[in-house]
Amino acid sequence: MAGVARMLAAVVCAIMPAAAMAAGGVGALEPSGWVRAHATFYGGADASGTMGGACGYGNLYAQGYGTRTAALSTALFNDGLACGQCYKLVCDRKTDRTWCKPGVSVTITATNFCPPNWDLPSDSGGWCNPPRPHFDMAQPAWEKIGIYRGGIIPVIYQRVPCMKKGGVRFTINGHDYFQLVLLTNVGAAGSIKAMDVKGSKSPDWMAMAHNWGAQWHSLAYLTGQGLSFRVTITDGQTLVFPNVVRPGWRFGQTFASNIQFK
């Protein structure tokens, strides 16, 4: 185990964003220790069956998550607050040399929920039953570390920073007095701890509430106003995205910022 950990260890620079809108003085997420779990796969050889899901990301190809994704068990999913987190997984050859591929790892993003199956025991089909940590991975990601016929493999995993290109994106859905905001392409910790919104006609920040998956909502009347967001991710970093949503926006639109967590 120690040899695998040394081989895969990554050095992460805790660099705070230089932009003046950064706040907090908290360093970026560093890799966690290694933890044991198991992993299965779903979604087909092209991962087309992984689209949608309990994080609300929709088309994972279009959103940039691709096929390196997984559904998390209850023990990891945290009612959707883990959406967007990244994990590095290695098949544990000390436990299973038959179905584990040697010397390789894969990094996935949490994009879905693997529900419990109370009709089956936790060690025989009810893989996602609490309190088991379990990854139901997109098949192409799973096959990076496991041999297809194995079906289920023991893994060791660690949470790692998410590496993203471009800025955080905001998709606005809902209706008047209910703005439902989906965040995608979130770097560093990947998952959201808190979020505030301010309209161009509003003097103050207004706290948003976690709705489901990677989506947060506001009950204020903000239709048509330019919108700024203040986002805190789960490693404690806070960034302000000023006027990222232009006045006159419509529900269903996505707005890409040029700001990213590091």
Curated annotation (Swiss-Prot):
Endpoints of the signal sequence: 1-22
Domain named Expansin-like EG45: residues: 52-167
Compartment(s) where it occurs, according to its Swiss-Prot or TrEMBL record: Secreted, Cell wall; Membrane
Membrane topology: Peripheral membrane protein
Organism superkingdom: Eukaryota
InterPro entries: Expan_Lol_pI, Expansin, Expansin/allergen_DPBB_dom, Expansin_CBD, Expansin_CBD_sf, RlpA-like_DPBB, RlpA-like_sf
Keywords: Cell wall, Cell wall biogenesis/degradation, Membrane, Secreted, Signal
Tissue: Expressed in roots and flowers.
GO cellular component: extracellular region; membrane
A single BP term in Gene Ontology: plant-type cell wall loosening
Entry's family note: Belongs to the expansin family. Expansin A subfamily.
Function: May cause loosening and extension of plant cell walls by disrupting non-covalent bonding between cellulose microfibrils and matrix glucans. No enzymatic activity has been found. May be required for rapid internodal elongation in deepwater rice during submergence.
PANTHER family according to UniProt: EXPANSIN-A15
Protein's name in the database: Expansin-A13
Organism of provenance: Oryza sativa subsp. japonica (Rice)
Gene this chain is encoded by: EXPA13
